[in-house]
Curated annotation (Swiss-Prot):
One of its GO terms (cellular component) is endoplasmic reticulum membrane. It is found in: Endoplasmic reticulum membrane. This is Probable aquaporin SIP2-1. Water channel required to facilitate the transport of water across cell membrane. Inactive in yeast cells. The lineage of its organism: Eukaryota, Viridiplantae, Streptophyta, Embryophyta, Tracheophyta. The chain crosses the membrane at residues 15-35, 39-59, 71-91, 122-142, 169-189, 202-222. It is a multi-pass membrane protein. Belongs to the MIP/aquaporin (TC 1.A.8) family. SIP (TC 1.A.8.10) subfamily. One of its GO terms (molecular function) is channel activity. It comes from Arabidopsis thaliana (Mouse-ear cress). A motif (NPA 1) lies at residues 69-71. A motif (NPA 2) lies at residues 180-182. Keywords: Endoplasmic reticulum, Membrane, Repeat, Transmembrane, Transmembrane helix, Transport.
């Protein structure tokens, strides 16, 4: 897929990702009638969330690289060459943000009673640290899964989905456990809070710095190990 195709795919997937989260909540709490305080309802919601992540993982594979999370685009851009980095930062990430904003606007138009998205419940620096730590681990895990089991779609998606869900639960009461600046930006834009210090530090600066740190850490720690493992293979051949 060419770069124009990737841009269009990013826009569509970002739009769909926001809608998917809302539809899961509507299905669990509206259609199935589970209370938001009912533990069994939360379990059902988590199951649907994992199914949703599998669907989007398949869509990413089917579109050969479509993304809906700016942090994934940033990690891919940093890991690639200079051209890839520029394309990710100045084209793909803005498009993913636009897709999220359009999705939230559409959701609010269709379901005016829908909530207002993630909310920060701790101090700004505490929130930035929380989102940063969650992001660091999920980026590190994603890169590790791509390298260690590149051909196993089910196993890679299963491990990644459980990890994302676990980290989301750990951070949900503090920052929402988002790990996706574009998704938060969509709701913040709808509330007129997209340029506040709280939003920029917690949901952008913290995760972006954590992503860069995770990519650097992975290259420094794991790449030499891979090279050492490749030497015996080269000798045997």
């Amino acid at each position: 897929m060419g770069r124009i195709g990737l841009v269009v795919t990013d826009l569509v997937l970002s739009f769909m990702w926001i809608w998917a989260g809302v539809l899961v909540n509507i299905l669990v709490h509206g259609v199935l009638g589970f209370s938001r305080t009912d533990p069994s309802g939360e379990i059902v919601r988590y199951l649907f969330s994992i199914i949703s992540m599998f669907i989007f993982a398949y869509l990413q594979q089917a579109t050969k690289g479509g993304l809906y999370n700016p942090l994934t685009a940033l990690a891919a851009g940093v890991s690639g060459g200079f051209s890839s980095f520029i394309f990710s930062v100045f084209v793909r990430i803005p498009v993913e943000v636009i897709g999220s904003i359009l999705a939230v606007k559409h959701i609010i138009h269709v379901f005016p009673e829908i909530g207002k998205g993630p909310k920060l419940n701790v101090a700004i620096h505490h929130g930035a640290l929380t989102e940063g730590i969650l992001t660091f681990f999920i980026v590190l895990l994603s890169m590790g899964l791509t390298r260690k089991i590149p051909g196993s779609f089910f196993m890679k998606t299963w491990i990644g989905s459980l990890a994302k869900l676990t980290l989301h639960i750990l951070g949900s009461d503090l920052t929402g456990g988002c790990m996706n600046p574009a998704a938060v930006m969509g709701w913040a834009y709808a509330r007129g809070e997209h340029i506040t210090k709280e939003h920029l530090l917690v949901y952008w600066l913290g995760p972006v710095k954590a992503t860069l740190l995770a990519v650097w850490f992975f290259k420094v720690v794991f790449k030499p190990l891979t090279e050492e493992q490749e030497k015996p293979k080269a000798k045997s051949e």
